[in-house]
């Protein structure tokens, strides 16, 4: 089976594909000649995909400008040019199936493949359907999804297949290499521990609330691993200079082996991107979610509310965030073992441990 994957711009579009590719490799499908990833030169995928040893090609495309509609004439022109580039790639590679996860590059590639009668499918990771996937839903053979709210947005009900997020299965296969928090950071493995992080670059709002809450948190009977993000680490370190933060708080720039750390955590404080949620639910980790307001269609809030509704998360909107509700939310989970266990069970019930296999099954069903 020859496969073209396409998607880009954000990790939520890229990591599900990388998880599927890893599973295909485990099944003996070579990344050398059977798999191709099509993205953009400027997107995050241009770094992640080649570094993983996966064949990578680019097409030139850009998103719609909602603030300056007149600039969208150029966007439409680029889209038409991109479909020509897509057709050339499709003719050369001759895929048996094309899978898109979102982003404008996905729109051009999957649309052109459908026009050429190549089997096509999309995967939607968020609870709010992105513009590209909403457009492609009319043309593809199958629509895979994670959240039930996303399924409601597609009128093409016969095409829908609930698969979960492929990142879930990948995380479960990785978490065997657990991090020894005592050996690595001198922390007590028998004490409740919370991980606070805002992604690899970090989140300003989360770092600010941590700085405001430190004097309270350092007196608590639990430990905190605070990953500031690489972008904010130096500025946080400057603000902490000469400040006694106690022995129960460890400040780091980022966590390299997240799947190895998550199983050791009693609770996590995080944004609510689709990839992060897939990791939390795969491992059944209770979470306090502070959704980013700076995302399209406020999809992080919708993702977070889905988890809260299931009893797997507490949600604090960024505008409502203050030291009182922040610390009391952490206390609620870390100091109430019964509640933490109930949250963990609810979280695990949402995870799909074989999500990659389910997506691959759909690929095999429709491939030519």
UniProtKB/Swiss-Prot annotation:
Primary location group: membrane
Topology relative to the membrane: Peripheral membrane protein
Chain positions recorded as UDP-N-acetyl-alpha-D-glucosamine binding sites: 10-12, 126, 200, 255, 300
GO biological process, alphabetically ordered: carbohydrate metabolic process; cell division; cell wall organization; lipid glycosylation; peptidoglycan biosynthetic process; regulation of cell shape
Compartmental location: Cell membrane
Membrane-spanning ranges: none
Catalytic activities: Mur2Ac(oyl-L-Ala-gamma-D-Glu-L-Lys-D-Ala-D-Ala)-di-trans,octa-cis-undecaprenyl diphosphate + UDP-N-acetyl-alpha-D-glucosamine = beta-D-GlcNAc-(1->4)-Mur2Ac(oyl-L-Ala-gamma-D-Glu-L-Lys-D-Ala-D-Ala)-di-trans,octa-cis-undecaprenyl diphosphate + UDP + H(+)
Alphabetic keyword roster: Cell cycle, Cell division, Cell membrane, Cell shape, Cell wall biogenesis/degradation, Glycosyltransferase, Membrane, Peptidoglycan synthesis, Transferase
Entry-linked PANTHER family: GLYCOSYLTRANSFERASE, UDP-N-ACETYLGLUCOSAMINE--N-ACETYLMURAMYL-(PENTAPEPTIDE) PYROPHOSPHORYL-UNDECAPRENOL N-ACETYLGLUCOSAMINE TRANSFERASE 1
Functional note: Cell wall formation. Catalyzes the transfer of a GlcNAc subunit on undecaprenyl-pyrophosphoryl-MurNAc-pentapeptide (lipid intermediate I) to form undecaprenyl-pyrophosphoryl-MurNAc-(pentapeptide)GlcNAc (lipid intermediate II).
Name of the protein in its database record: UDP-N-acetylglucosamine--N-acetylmuramyl-(pentapeptide) pyrophosphoryl-undecaprenol N-acetylglucosamine transferase
């Amino acid at each position: 089976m020859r496969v073209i994957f396409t998607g880009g711009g954000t990790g939520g579009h890229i990591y599900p594909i990388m998880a599927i590719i890893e599973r295909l490799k485990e099944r003996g499908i070579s990344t050398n000649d059977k798999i191709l990833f099509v993205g953009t030169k400027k997107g995050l995928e241009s770094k992640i995909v080649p570094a993983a040893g996966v064949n990578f090609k680019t097409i030139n495309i850009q998103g719609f400008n909602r603030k300056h509609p007149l600039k969208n004439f150029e966007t439409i022109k680029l889209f038409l040019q991109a479909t020509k580039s897509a057709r050339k790639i499709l003719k050369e590679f001759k895929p048996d199936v094309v899978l898109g996860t979102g982003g404008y590059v996905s729109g051009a590639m999957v649309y052109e493949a459908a026009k050429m009668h190549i089997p096509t499918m999309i995967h939607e990771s968020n609870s709010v359907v992105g513009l590209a996937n909403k457009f492609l839903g009319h043309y593809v053979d199958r629509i895979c999804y994670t959240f039930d709210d996303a399924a409601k947005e597609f009128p093409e009900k016969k095409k829908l297949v609930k698969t979960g997020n492929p990142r879930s299965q990948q995380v479960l296969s990785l978490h065997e290499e657990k991090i020894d928090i005592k050996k690595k950071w001198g922390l007590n493995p028998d004490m409740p521990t919370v991980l606070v992080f805002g992604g690899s670059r970090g989140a300003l709002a989360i770092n600010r609330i941590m700085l405001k809450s430190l004097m309270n948190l350092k007196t608590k009977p639990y430990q905190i691993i605070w990953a500031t993000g690489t972008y904010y680490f130096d500025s946080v370190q400057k603000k902490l200079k000469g400040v006694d933060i106690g022995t129960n708080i460890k400040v780091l720039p980022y966590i390299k082996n997240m799947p190895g750390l998550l199983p050791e955590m009693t609770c996590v404080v995080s944004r609510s991107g689709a990839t992060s949620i897939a990791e939390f639910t795969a491992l059944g980790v209770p979470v306090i979610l502070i959704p980013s307001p700076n995302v399209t269609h406020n999809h992080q809030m919708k993702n977070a509310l889905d988890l809260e509704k299931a009893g797997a998360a507490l949600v604090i909107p960024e505008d409502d965030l203050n030291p009182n509700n922040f610390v009391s939310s952490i206390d609620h989970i870390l100091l109430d073992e019964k509640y933490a266990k109930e949250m963990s069970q609810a979280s695990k019930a949402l995870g799909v441990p074989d999500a990659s296999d389910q997506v691959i099954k759909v690929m095999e069903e429709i491939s030519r």
